[in-house]
């Protein structure tokens, strides 16, 4: 009902406003007490509006408050001033504020006003325990409920009565609190924890003052360890030495700490199930030194040290020998002695084997006698051992054998292995390989197994092995190993001795050669487009010749040759082509010219004769056709063929008296003649 009444009033006011004229003269904001306030201070933001209207009553308008362009308060009013109240200002209230007035379709907004809130409220700090044992954990809770996260927290662990910060932790939380664990160290006694909070205002961080927690009392988990030495006064070698380290443990402790006794850095005794650790040993002078007792549990460690001095009963024995390096067959002499020459029991040992129970020991050295020797001297319960002395007995090397691993002939450029071996002799053995009497390689071998050198010989080569070891005898040489190297055929060429142009009838000599190749080499001569060689020859040389006595045009063309030997990787190598041209001798050319000219002349004579005969026949034909037929004297098979015979018959007046008329016949052109004659 109330809502309906309110809507009716607003509608009425709106209608009234539409009927009346109005204008928004001005609008601005004010902050009470100011635009810069302290944290927690009450703040009132006012929006002041000046409106002119023709209405007798004030028009109803809407006032909106914005912070950083976000609406924070909205009210409808007819008053000139409207307020937005913040009871306790905080850092998150800081920002840029403005207000807007809306009256019907008219609207006006103020400029932006910067509100600054100075200071940060004090945080609260609590601890989860007020008493803690060394090695424990204290959880600190630092909170600030007034401000909005993210909030920056800084917590410090401080020893009461000092200004030294023992540990500091920082964390930015998206909540209003933070929980941070602090370990309790052995140097901690009475602690307080300080907390500081910070809030980001724009680009500036505003921080609070430090606030301190309640006191936290630290109890010792265990005390500093203490030493007890027995016997308490002078300790002589042979006495039983007892070193005890003890510690006091807090009654709240749920387990014992670990107790460690060290001499220098070596651990000599430990205990994990007791309040003490004991190191007991028969005293020797080497037990003198600094002893440290450490008590450790998690992060807690405490230690104390003591110096122990032990009086020497007699010095350590010394083992002397004739030489530390002997040739096999020489005498090995060992002697054990103690300074001051006290009465003692002696033994001489090789590793763990007792060789003698006297001060001296001698024998003929063999290779198996190599090893570490020592001696002992004992007085009462005290037994001391000398330093270890190395002895090496060298067996002389046997003459080395030398051999290579090639199963077939060695081809130039291939890798071969040259092996050397001395079957007998003390290792390590130094092998030195000579190649062509010059040092090639040196290798040391720790056994009598063969040693292998690799090489790529390019020609016949001699190898020799030299071996040496610890023996005093001079180095030993092997026999000389001779290696024969065969070279494959390389660069086949073909040439002609008389030049590429050969005169017909002369001798033609072709030469096929290789740059390199171990014989025997097989050469083959080919003519282009012929599948089989026309000449083949195998020689122990790098070249071969082919002779042809009488050269003719048949020998003209392109030639090539091939060559191969047993070292050839491919079947054969082929030369490039050689072009041979055959030309005629000058006298042959002249003879041919004479013959040709003679043939031409003969042909011309025959042609001329033939021509004149034809012409004569052509003249005679019309005469024969114009005279009467002449009786045949012979049978029908006889013919009158010669014009001279016919002429004679005309003048034979005795046989026949005939009148005739001479007719002059003009000569015809050959084509006309052929056209008219049958």
Curated annotation (Swiss-Prot):
Single GO term (MF): protein homodimerization activity
Domain of life from the UniProt record: Eukaryota
Record field: transmembrane: 590-610
PTM: Phosphorylated on Ser and Tyr residues after cellular activation. In endothelial cells Fyn mediates mechanical-force (stretch or pull) induced tyrosine phosphorylation. Phosphorylated on tyrosine residues by FER and FES in response to FCER1 activation.
Entry's localization field: Cell membrane; Membrane raft; Cell junction
Chain ranges of the Ig-like C2-type domain: 40-126, 135-213, 225-309, 315-391, 413-472, 488-577
Glycosylation sites: 74, 141, 309, 345, 360, 424, 540
InterPro entries, A to Z: Ig-like_dom, Ig-like_dom_sf, Ig-like_fold, Ig_Fc_receptor, Ig_sub, Ig_sub2, Immunoglobulin_dom
Signal sequence, start to end: 1-17
Disulfide bonds: 47-99, 142-195, 245-293, 336-375, 420-465, 512-561
Cytoplasmic side, ranges: 611-678
Keyword Transmembrane: yes
Motif ITIM motif, residue range(s) on this chain: 658-663
One GO CC term, this protein: cell-cell contact zone
Topological domains, Extracellular: 18-589
Region of interest (Disordered), residue spans: 634-653
GO biological process terms, semicolon-separated: angiogenesis; bicellular tight junction assembly; cell adhesion; cell surface receptor signaling pathway; cell-cell adhesion; cell-cell adhesion via plasma-membrane adhesion molecules; cellular response to mechanical stimulus; cellular response to transforming growth factor beta stimulus
Membrane protein topology class: Single-pass type I membrane protein
Residues with Phosphotyrosine modification: 660
Domain notes per entry: The Ig-like C2-type domains 2 and 3 contribute to formation of the complex with BDKRB2 and in regulation of its activity.
Biological role stated in the UniProt entry: Cell adhesion molecule which is required for leukocyte transendothelial migration (TEM) under most inflammatory conditions. Tyr-660 plays a critical role in TEM and is required for efficient trafficking of PECAM1 to and from the lateral border recycling compartment (LBRC) and is also essential for the LBRC membrane to be targeted around migrating leukocytes. Trans-homophilic interaction may play a role in endothelial cell-cell adhesion via cell junctions. Heterophilic interaction with CD177 plays a role in transendothelial migration of neutrophils.
Designated name of the protein: Platelet endothelial cell adhesion molecule
Organism of origin: Rattus norvegicus (Rat)
């Amino acid at each position: 009902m109330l809502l309906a009444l309110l809507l009716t009033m607003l509608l009425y006011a709106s209608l009234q406003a539409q009927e009346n004229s109005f204008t928004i003269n001005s609008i601005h904001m004010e902050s009470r007490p100011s635009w810069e306030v302290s944290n927690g201070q009450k703040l009132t933001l006012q929006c002041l509006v000046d409106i002119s209207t023709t209405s007798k009553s004030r028009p109803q308008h809407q006032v909106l408050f914005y912070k950083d362009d976000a609406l924070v308060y909205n009210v409808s009013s007819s008053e000139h001033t409207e307020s937005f109240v913040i009871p306790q200002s905080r850092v998150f209230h800081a920002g840029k504020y403005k207000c807007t007035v809306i009256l019907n379709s008219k609207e006006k907004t103020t400029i932006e006003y910067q509100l600054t809130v100075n200071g940060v409220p004090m945080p609260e700090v609590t601890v989860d325990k007020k008493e803690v044992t060394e090695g424990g954990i204290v959880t600190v809770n630092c909170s600030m409920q007034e401000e909005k996260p993210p909030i920056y927290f800084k917590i410090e662990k401080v020893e009461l009565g000092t200004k030294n910060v023992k540990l500091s932790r920082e964390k930015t939380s998206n909540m209003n609190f933070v929980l941070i664990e602090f370990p309790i160290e052995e140097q901690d006694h009475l602690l307080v924890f300080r907390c500081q909070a910070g809030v980001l205002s724009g680009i500036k961080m505003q921080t609070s003052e430090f606030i301190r927690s309640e006191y936290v009392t630290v109890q010792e988990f265990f005390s500093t360890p203490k030493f007890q030495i027995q016997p308490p006064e002078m300790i002589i070698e042979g006495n039983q030495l007892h070193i005890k380290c003890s510690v006091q443990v807090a009654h709240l402790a749920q387990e014992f700490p670990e107790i460690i006794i060290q001499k220098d850095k070596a651990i000599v005794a430990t205990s994990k199930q007791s309040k003490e650790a004991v190191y007991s040993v028969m005293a020797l002078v080497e037990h003198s030194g600094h002893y440290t007792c450490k008590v450790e549990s998690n992060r807690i460690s405490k230690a104390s040290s003591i110096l122990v001095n032990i009086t020497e009963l007699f010095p350590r024995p010394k083992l002397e020998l004739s030489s530390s390096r002997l040739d096999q067959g020489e005498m090995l002499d060992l002697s054990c002695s103690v300074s001051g020459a006290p009465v003692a029991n002696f033994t001489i040992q090789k590793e763990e084997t007792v060789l003698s129970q006297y001060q001296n020991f001698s024998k003929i050295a063999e290779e198996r006698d190599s090893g570490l020797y020592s001696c002992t001297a004992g007085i009462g319960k005290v037994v001391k051992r000398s330093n270890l002395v190395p002895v090496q007995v060298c067996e002389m090397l046997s003459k080395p054998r030398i051999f290579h691993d090639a199963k077939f002939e060695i081809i130039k450029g291939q890798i071969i292995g040259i092996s050397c071996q001395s079957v007998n002799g003390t290792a390590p053995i130094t092998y030195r390989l000579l190649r062509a009497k010059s040092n090639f390689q040196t290798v040391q071998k720790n056994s009598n197994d063969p040693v292998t050198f690799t090489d790529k010989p390019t020609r016949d080569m001699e190898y020799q092995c030299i071996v040496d070891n610890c023996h005093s005898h001079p180095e030993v040489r092997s026999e000389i190993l001779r290696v024969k190297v065969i070279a494959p055929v390389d660069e086949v060429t073909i040439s002609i001795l008389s030049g590429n142009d050969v005169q017909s009838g002369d001798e033609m000599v072709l030469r096929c050669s290789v740059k390199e190749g171990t014989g025997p080499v097989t050469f083959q001569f080919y003519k282009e487009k012929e599948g089989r060689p026309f000449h083949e020859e195998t020689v122990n040389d790098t070249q071969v010749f082919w002779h042809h006595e009488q050269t003719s045009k048949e020998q003209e063309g392109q030639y090539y040759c091939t060559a191969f030997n047993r070292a050839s990787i491919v079947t054969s190598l082929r030369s490039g082509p050689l072009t041979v041209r055959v030309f005629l001798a000058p006298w042959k050319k002249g003879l041919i010219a004479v013959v040709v000219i003679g043939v031409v002349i003969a042909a011309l004579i025959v042609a001329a004769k033939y021509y004149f005969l034809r012409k004569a026949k052509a003249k005679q034909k019309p005469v024969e056709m114009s005279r009467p037929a002449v009786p045949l004297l012979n049978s029908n098979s006889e013919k009158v063929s010669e014009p001279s015979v016919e002429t004679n018959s005309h003048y034979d007046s005795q046989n026949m008296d005939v009148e005739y008329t001479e007719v002059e016949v003009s000569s015809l052109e050959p084509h006309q003649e052929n056209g008219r004659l049958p």
